[in-house]
């Protein structure tokens, strides 16, 4: 479950239909405890995770400690579903987020509306944190594409519309489309959820998200249209990787401005290797 979903559920159980007013009440409670420490506590549900803080996340972490006591949860449980900054870098321009023991490239974090699985909302009553990350395009449990719009055309973002699955514009239940079914996308979603999916590598979850970041860098996208290519790449590993390196060398030799003798390895293979500095890992056992 995402941290946003948790707060929405707590708000609903305490009689708040709009989570914003619940957060306003929570902030008032926290300010009574320590005005200076909790002055920056957000009342926008989209900014509730510690990583959203512009300067530092200590005050939000302290706030989660207090809220865990109010909701009768262990602090470690509530902090375990929060997204925090992490010092690890997946590439020179890509920092990481950490949730529990799972490290995810920040580049995959969705910036717009968060799509959802209507079946999950109806069956489980909460939202998954995986919905917040590109690459996870299908629900691996219900084999349906995540949606961000109701059939009436209105955007459905659970952070504002809630967890009921009811469109705030037309009042109808949102439903998953069975059109354009992509079994390959579901296989990738299952793999990102921790399942063993051949031919994809059996590695820890953090590495799987790292591979999605790497693939998005070399293919400029990790959307549905590249799912077949992604699976084929691992099906023919390592020959597919050797072929990719060969293409990159040929292209950079042909279009280079400098003479070949002046080229650095970074100039030739930068997109493949330097854009993903965490791969391969120092731990040889984790290498593919």
Question: What residue spans do the PLM features occupy?
Answer:
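Basic, alpha-helical nucleic-acid-binding regions used in initiation and control of genome expression
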Residues: 1-288
């Amino acid at each position: 479950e995402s941290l946003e979903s948790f707060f929405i559920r707590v708000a609903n159980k305490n009689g708040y239909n709009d989570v914003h007013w619940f957060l306003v009440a929570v902030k008032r409670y926290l300010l009574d405890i320590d005005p200076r420490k909790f002055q920056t506590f957000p009342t926008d549900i989209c900014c509730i995770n510690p990583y959203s803080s512009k300067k530092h996340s200590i005050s939000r972490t302290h706030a989660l400690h207090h809220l865990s006591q109010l909701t009768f949860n262990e602090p470690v449980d509530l902090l375990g579903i929060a997204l925090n900054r992490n010092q690890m870098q997946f590439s020179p321009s890509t920092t990481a987020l950490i949730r529990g023991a799972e490290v995810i490239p920040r580049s995959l974090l969705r910036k717009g509306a968060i799509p959802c699985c209507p079946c999950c909302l109806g069956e489980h009553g909460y939202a998954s944190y995986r919905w917040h990350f590109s690459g996870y395009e299908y629900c691996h449990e219900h084999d349906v594409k995540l949606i961000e719009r109701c059939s009436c055309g209105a955007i459905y973002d659970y952070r504002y519309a809630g967890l009921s699955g009811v469109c705030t514009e037309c009042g109808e239940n949102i439903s998953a489309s069975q059109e354009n079914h992509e079994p390959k996308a579901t296989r990738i979603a299952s793999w990102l959820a921790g399942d063993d999916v051949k031919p994809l590598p059996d590695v820890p979850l953090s590495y799987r998200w790292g591979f999605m970041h790497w693939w998005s860098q070399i293919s400029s996208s990790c959307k549905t249209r590249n799912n077949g290519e992604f699976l084929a790449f691992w099906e023919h590993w390592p020959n597919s990787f050797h072929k990719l390196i060969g293409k990159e060398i040929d292209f950079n030799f042909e279009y280079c401005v400098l003479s070949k003798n002046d080229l650095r390895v970074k100039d030739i293979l930068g997109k493949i290797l330097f854009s993903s500095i965490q791969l391969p890992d120092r731990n040889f056992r984790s290498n593919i």
